[in-house]
């Protein structure tokens, strides 16, 4: 497997003046792309989890902002900068926890503010969105190489949720590390939690790894601790939707349980995320907004209700949880690696950054 030219899966691509998103709700049964021709449809696709994963959401938001600017020029002419504000706000509200979303929109807004108001901004905005996409592809490769170098040959690894090409613009974050380590002969066995209730592990991660010819064993989320106790796993490798300034990590629900089990059983925990996922404005995990989704996602599976039909039966459905920094052994970013992360280590990643 050549990770340098990896292009097995594309979660999103720009063509024919629109953003095409691989509809991840339909995988692995159907590979169908949804075309988004305006910012509102991009925002709805993010909310509905057509596209998911913090880096991919950020890339999609960049393209959504480009569509917003193009539409504002057509409608308002020289007033396009003010005209795109409503669409930007709609995009910003689409998913509250993934910080890459806000990061990409702030970057696009700042770029738009530097453009002349009396010229069509569409080509320049599209080029900036494509730059965000290309930078994510490059960051994935750097993180994959850095993270793989920490893994000893013959290791077993466990991952949670989906952090591959479906969740990013390129190779993946945590799954990018696993792909690279597999290609290097460092990983002997890959385990993936099924990741209820959306089953991103069994539907998406297993699908990606199978496409690459990498064997993977799925397990129920509740089996992770028992697996670690057997000694078959040396690393738990996960992504992140937001990392606070002190190193606390918000990620897919169940990550905290994986981290606790890993610490109990001597398994090291690696978090892999681009620096756009780090929110220096959020001091600690307690301040990270945690999205809660519809109870039906827990009460139903495959379109069929699996819980009793009773008003007495409800569901609690937070999408993310927060893992304290003290449970994290290493955070891998495109700018460097932070061992035993804390506020000082996180801050050093941004030293000299423009």
UniProtKB/Swiss-Prot annotation:
Active site: 241 (proton donor)
Pathway assignment: Amino-acid biosynthesis; L-methionine biosynthesis via salvage pathway; L-methionine from S-methyl-5-thio-alpha-D-ribose 1-phosphate: step 1/6
Pfam families noted in UniProt: IF-2B
Site (Transition state stabilizer): 161
GO molecular function, one term: S-methyl-5-thioribose-1-phosphate isomerase activity
UniProt binding sites for substrate: 52-54, 95, 200, 251-252
Presence of the UniProt keyword NAD in the record: no
An example Gene Ontology biological process: L-methionine salvage from methylthioadenosine
Known EC number: 5.3.1.23
UniProt superkingdom: Bacteria
Keywords from the named record: Amino-acid biosynthesis, Isomerase, Methionine biosynthesis
InterPro entries: IF-2B-related, IF-M1Pi, IF_2B-like_C, Initiation_fac_2B_a/b/d, M1Pi_N, NagB/RpiA_transferase-like
Reactions accelerated catalytically: 5-(methylsulfanyl)-alpha-D-ribose 1-phosphate = 5-(methylsulfanyl)-D-ribulose 1-phosphate
Family of this protein: Belongs to the eIF-2B alpha/beta/delta subunits family. MtnA subfamily.
Function: Catalyzes the interconversion of methylthioribose-1-phosphate (MTR-1-P) into methylthioribulose-1-phosphate (MTRu-1-P).
PANTHER family from the UniProt entry: METHYLTHIORIBOSE-1-PHOSPHATE ISOMERASE
The protein's name: Methylthioribose-1-phosphate isomerase
Natural source organism: Halorhodospira halophila (strain DSM 244 / SL1) (Ectothiorhodospira halophila (strain DSM 244 / SL1))
Organism classification: Bacteria, Pseudomonadati, Pseudomonadota, Gammaproteobacteria, Chromatiales
Name of the gene: mtnA
């Amino acid at each position: 497997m050549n990770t340098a030219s990896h292009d097995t899966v594309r979660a999103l691509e720009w063509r024919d003046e629109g953003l095409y998103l691989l509809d991840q709700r339909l995988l692995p049964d159907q590979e169908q792309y949804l075309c988004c021709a305006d910012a509102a449809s991009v925002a709805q696709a993010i909310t509905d989890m057509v596209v998911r994963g913090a880096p991919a959401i950020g890339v999609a938001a960049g393209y959504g902002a480009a569509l917003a600017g193009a539409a504002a020029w057509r409608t308002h002419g020289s007033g396009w900068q003010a005209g795109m504000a409503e669409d930007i706000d709609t995009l910003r509200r689409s998913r509250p926890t993934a910080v890459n979303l806000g990061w990409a929109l702030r970057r696009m807004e700042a770029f738009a503010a530097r453009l002349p108001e009396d010229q069509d901004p569409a080509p320049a905005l599209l080029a900036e969105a494509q730059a965000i996409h290309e930078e994510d592809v490059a960051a994935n490769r750097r993180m994959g190489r850095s993270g793989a170098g920490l893994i000893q040959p013959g290791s077993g690894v466990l991952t949670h949720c989906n952090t591959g090409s479906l969740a990013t613009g390129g190779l993946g974050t945590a799954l990018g590390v696993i792909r690279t380590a597999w290609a290097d002969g460092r990983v002997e066995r890959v385990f993936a939690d099924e990741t209820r209730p959306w089953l991103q592990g069994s539907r998406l991660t297993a699908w990606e790894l199978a496409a690459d010819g990498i064997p993977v064993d799925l397990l129920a989320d509740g089996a992770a601790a028992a697996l670690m106790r057997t000694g078959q796993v040396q690393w738990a490798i996960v992504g992140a939707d937001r990392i606070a300034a002190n190193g606390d990590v918000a990620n897919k629900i169940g990550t905290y349980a994986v981290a606790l089990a890993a610490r109990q059983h001597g398994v090291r925990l690696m978090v892999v995320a681009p620096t756009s996922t780090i929110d220096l404005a959020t001091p600690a995990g307690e301040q990270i907004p945690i999205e809660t989704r519809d109870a039906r996602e827990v009460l139903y599976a495959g379109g069929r209700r699996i819980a009793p039909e009773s008003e007495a039966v409800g569901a609690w459905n937070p999408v993310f949880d927060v893992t304290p920094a003290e449970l994290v052994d290493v955070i891998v970013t495109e700018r460097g690696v932070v061992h035993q992360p804390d506020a000082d280590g996180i801050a050093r990643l941004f030293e000299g950054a423009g």
